[in-house]
Curated annotation (Swiss-Prot):
Protein name: Iron-sulfur cluster insertion protein ErpA
Sample GO molecular function, one term: iron ion binding
Family per record: Belongs to the HesB/IscA family.
GO terms under biological process: iron-sulfur cluster assembly
Cellular component aspect of the GO annotation: cytosol
Residues annotated to bind iron-sulfur cluster: 44, 108, 110
Gene: erpA
Taxonomic source organism: Shewanella denitrificans (strain OS217 / ATCC BAA-1090 / DSM 15013)
PROSITE patterns reported for this sequence: HESB
């Protein structure tokens, strides 16, 4: 498990996302939960983002801690997310976690899938 400071991170975890995760974890009353972000094959553009809560992390996972919560990314997914940002938005269209990914050459309309 690799933990780094804000300046040295290959991926960013915004305050908005961290605050939302913190609120969700307080509701669950499970301090072991972490937000896991991953990339899988699929979606309309070739790859898709996934978000889940996970109690475990592997020794080779990349971990960012902010606002007292942890974001976890496996090494395979991290290569597609370098330079990106995990954020959270809430608006008329609903609320969701999302990834701003500079490596994506195209994305689908919903923003859940991308190609490189």
């Amino acid at each position: 498990m690799t933990e780094q400071t804000d300046a040295a991170m290959p991926i960013k975890f915004t305050d908005a996302a961290a605050i939302k995760v913190k609120g969700l974890l307080e509701e669950e009353q499970n301090p072991e939960l972490k937000l896991r972000v991953y990339v899988t094959g699929g979606g309309c553009s070739g790859f898709q983002y996934g978000f889940t809560f996970d109690e475990k992390s592997s020794a080779d996972d990349f971990v960012i801690e902010k606002q007292g919560v942890k974001l976890v990314v496996d090494p395979m997914s991290l290569q597609y997310l370098v330079g990106g940002e995990v954020d959270y938005t809430s608006g008329l269209e609903g609320s969701r976690f999302f990834v701003k990914n500079p490596n994506a050459s195209s994305t689908c309309g919903c923003g859940a899938s991308f190609s490189v």
